[in-house]
Amino acid sequence: MITIEREAMEFDVVIVGAGPAGLSAAIKIRQLAIENNLPDLSVCVVEKGSEVGAHILSGAVLEPRAINELFPNWKEEGAPLNVPVTEDKTYFLMSDEKSQEAPHWMVPKTMHNDGNYVISLGNVVRWLGQKAEELEVSIFPGFAAAEILYHADGTVKGIQTGDMGIGKDGEPTHNFAPGYELHAKYTLFAEGCRGHLGKRLINKFNLDQDADPQHYGIGIKELWEIDPAKHKPGLVMHGSGWPLSETGSSGGWWLYHAENNQVTLGMIVDLSYENPHMFPFMEMQRWKTHPLIKQYLEGGKRISYGARAVVKGGLNSLPKLTFPGGCLIGDDAGFLNFAKIKGSHTAMKSGMLCGEAVFEAIARGVDKGGDLAIARVVEGEDLFDKELTTYTQKFDKSWLKEELHRSRNFGPAMHKFGLWIGGAFNFVDQNIFKVPFTLHDLQPDYSALKTQDQATFKPNYPKPDGKLTFDRLSSVFVSNTVHEENQPSHLKLTDASIPVAVNLPRWDEPAQRYCPAGVYEIVDEGEGNKRFQINAANCVHCKTCDIKDPSQNITWVTPEGGGGPNYPNM
């Protein structure tokens, strides 16, 4: 076995992921360090995307509460919040032709968007990255965090970035470059929904032992440039019903009018769906043919496409936030408010709360004689708190906890009671009075899938026309997804026989359909032989396979840094 020598770099804080949570944490730490005369406190952010914002995908309507706190003068400082919400409409699609708008008073207050902004979260994150660099945060795009490093006592020591130049055979190629070790007093994990290192930490430290199972959806999004005559900047539309109602599946859709004659539209399909024949990508394509949606897109042009799992378990599914040497923030923990269909402001606030706790712990350690820019290198030293319990305390006293507590029943009600009764329950809970009990949803999403014998209904998905509706491969093309071809697959099978031997006869191998990028195929090799093929280069890093595989046989790990989608203005 080859021993690889790695360069190690020391920081006070290492943050994994340059999204809204990670960058808000970095900014808050550096703001406090400068304000309190600790200007040498060092913060490093590693980002697997080719640039900050490359992997960011969201609706998005931003509630500005957190950014107001982080940058009170954000407007003067040029934050790209340029389109205030001007109209707020909610619809139920009754069929492929009919729709009904809900009166505003019937919509849960959590879904009202007064004072919010239609944004590109990718562009907001790029702006946050610039502000972080102005505060001397070190940001390393194109470096994927591949492994967690531990001290001998089990405390998290930092992370190792992925090696570059490993061939498909697992051996170093001529351009091999070893990954770096990044050591820190505290390591914050902000990888987004279903982060692969966050998943390991939750398992290692049993962080979810007192929580409900986490729940997810798959969000599929397109960006269109439309006829200026049809463009209504600030119009926000949400809805549910057809076509998901045909398979008894839950989820919803959005269409937002942004700036520059662009609309962002998409669908979230709850990954608790039961019918193995359901095809989330094609459900979204079919939805666009409804007259309510089609009217805006006709004569327009699709600019970009993307997909990403979203975390929706809320407060009931929130794991323990801290462990020795680090914390989970943002959607790595699961702070999205499903009742609002928003997670950007909650991710930012979680990062800010954690940033405050980190700074205070480091400042206390320095007061005791600890050094800056040197990780916790002495085993058992007590100059710096091993576990940041103050982060949890700050969360418990925050508006973030209050907001998530208020919304804790929203998802379980929809899952337990269905669209109509669940919707009525949520209207009462959110608009009239707070119910004095908590609902729980204890079934993991992957286990909800029925066998193909139990679910005989197969939806009809027309062939895409290439103008309004599209196939997956042409969609991946406009996501600008690129991977180094000569590298090991980052989609790992625990047992390579399961897709054909188990999943195919039981569920018609649902990976063929739940993947929004066409990564998984069943190839007929003749004479009754079938093969499971993984087209890893197509992967848009949505993590759906890691979540929904009914045999829990697929594990997503990070490919080479810089690979994956390159989302513009998404």
Curated annotation (Swiss-Prot):
Keywords: 4Fe-4S, Electron transport, FAD, Flavoprotein, Iron, Iron-sulfur, Metal-binding, Oxidoreductase, Transport, Ubiquinone. Signal peptide: none annotated. The keyword Transport applies. It catalyses: a ubiquinone + reduced [electron-transfer flavoprotein] = a ubiquinol + oxidized [electron-transfer flavoprotein] + H(+). FAD binds at residues 13-27. InterPro entries: 4Fe4S_Fe-S-bd, ETF-QO, ETF-QO/FixC_UQ-bd, ETF-QO/FixX_C, FAD/NAD-bd_sf. Binds 1 [4Fe-4S] cluster. It comes from the Bacteria. Its cofactor is [4Fe-4S] cluster; FAD. Accepts electrons from ETF and reduces ubiquinone. This is Probable electron transfer flavoprotein-ubiquinone oxidoreductase. It comes from Acinetobacter baylyi (strain ATCC 33305 / BD413 / ADP1). The lineage of its organism: Bacteria, Pseudomonadati, Pseudomonadota, Gammaproteobacteria, Moraxellales.
